[in-house]
């Protein structure tokens, strides 16, 4: 089974998305990956974000980011 891939930038984790990643890591149906940089530097400086199956998803708070990630997955099923 192919799992959705959620990618985080280490710089953004330090800016606050760490909590979102920790919440998402508890979900066995997601593949969570950390990278040193995802090349979204301008947006990374402005908001919490993750790439969800390669698409940019953001949130004002870690909780909102988690909510937006799950919403994105519901609206964009892999199959």
Curated annotation (Swiss-Prot):
* InterPro entries noted in UniProt: DUF1450, UPF0349
Q: Which family does it belong to?
A: Belongs to the UPF0349 family.
Record-given protein name: UPF0349 protein GTNG_2908
- The protein's organism comes out as Geobacillus thermodenitrificans (strain NG80-2)
Q: Which Pfam families match?
A: DUF1450
Give the highest taxon in the source lineage: Bacteria
């Amino acid at each position: 089974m192919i799992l959705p891939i959620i990618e985080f930038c280490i710089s953004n984790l330090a800016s606050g998305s760490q909590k979102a990643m920790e919440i998402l890591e508890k979900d066995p149906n997601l593949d969570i990956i950390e990278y040193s940089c995802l090349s979204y530097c301008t947006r990374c400086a402005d908001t919490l974000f993750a790439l969800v199956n390669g698409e940019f998803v953001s949130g004002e708070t870690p909780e909102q980011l988690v909510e937006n990630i799950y919403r994105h997955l519901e609206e964009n099923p892999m199959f």
